[in-house]
């Protein structure tokens, strides 16, 4: 059955794809404007699915999808995630109400992502482990 979601639900997947593609989270100022030269590299994103938990680990220029035990399931260039994020953003901007995005759903299945959002009892879709560069002392 095809995944159907509204703009907000698809935006959660867009965020996952964009973060994995860029590999970093940018800081913002008090007006929520991106500070381009201040960012935190992403070490890993954790996502809970019905089938279990999956770790999306950034290694070099790849996203490595693993089980919590560290078993590698799939390795994909991070650049592919950026392309898919842009395709999804285009679909989000072109649609209203509830809609499907079959090509993105196919990619989601490939990367062990089978739901648009977390269970209603859990408001956390993803957990991000960051590398805080300010903690490095030379």
Which residues does each PLM region occupy?
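Conserved small/polar residues in nucleotide/adenosyl-binding loops
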Residues: 136-138
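Short, surface-exposed loop/strand segments
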Residues: 1-134
């Amino acid at each position: 059955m095809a995944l159907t979601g509204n703009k907000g639900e698809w935006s959660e997947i867009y965020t996952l794809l964009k973060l994995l593609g860029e590999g970093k989270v940018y800081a913002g100022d008090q007006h929520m404007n991106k500070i381009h030269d201040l960012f935190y590299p992403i070490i890993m994103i954790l996502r809970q699915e019905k089938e279990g938990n999956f770790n999306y680990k950034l290694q070099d220029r790849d996203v490595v999808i693993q089980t919590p035990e560290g078993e590698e399931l799939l390795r994909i260039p991070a650049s592919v995630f950026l392309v898919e994020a842009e395709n999804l953003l285009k679909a989000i901007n072109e649609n209203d109400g509830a809609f499907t995005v079959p090509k993105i759903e196919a990619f989601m299945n490939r990367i062990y992502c089978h739901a648009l959002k977390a269970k209603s009892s859990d408001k956390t879709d993803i957990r991000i482990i960051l590398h805080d560069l300010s903690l490095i002392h030379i």
